[in-house]
Amino acid sequence: KNKGIEDLIDVYSNLLKKENFNKLELNLLIGGVGSENYIKSLNKKISNKNIQFLGYVEDRFSFFNSIEIFIFPSYSEGLGLVLLEAMSYGVLCITRDVTPMNSIINNGENGFLFKDNNELLEKIEKALELNSSEKDNMVKSALEKIEKSYSIMQMYLSIDKAYN
């Protein structure tokens, strides 16, 4: 529940009810691990064949290269490494407006932030409606953020600074 998966499924279902999106072939792929009982309870709620639970995603390269938008609905995270990974693969990201994700994503610049389900729906719509130039600019900005703040060299410099 803390991961926000139920919220994401609800929002996805609402998106498909909207006239301008109900004809699109939109698939929701949910990666990550959870208890078997939790996954079973989610599966009971789902009537849509376009929602897939992938479990642990071992081949991140293939996964991130197969998606257009990465949605990180978690209510709390330590760092949100998977968000950084998605950004580094050049995937447009949408994440909950909580710390530390809101220090990684600058809303509307290198991704989108949302506070509640209504905003998540709005941000998904906005992301789907971006033209290729707008999307490319956001992805480029995200890659620059990763390089500037989260590259191996930046991590090394931060650790070195902390100890010296």
Task: Walk through the language-model features, giving the residues of each.
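Short hydrophobic beta-strand element within catalytic cores of glycosyltransferases
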Residues: 92-95
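A short, well-ordered alpha-helix in the C-terminal region of glycosyltransferases
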Residues: 134-149, 157-161
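A structural motif in glycosyltransferase catalytic domains
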Residues: 8-12, 28, 120, 159
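Conserved acidic donor-binding segment of nucleotide-sugar-dependent glycosyltransferases
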Residues: 107-108, 112-118, 127-132
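Aromatic "clamp/platform" in nucleotide-sugar-dependent glycosyltransferases that forms part
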Residues: 56, 75
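Short acidic/histidine- and often glycine-rich active-site loop of Leloir-type glycosyltransferases
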Residues: 84, 98-108, 112-113
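Short, structured helix-loop element that forms part of the nucleotide-activated donor/catalytic region
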Residues: 17-19, 27-50, 54
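A conserved mid-protein helix/loop that constitutes part of the nucleotide-sugar donor-binding site
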Residues: 1-16, 37
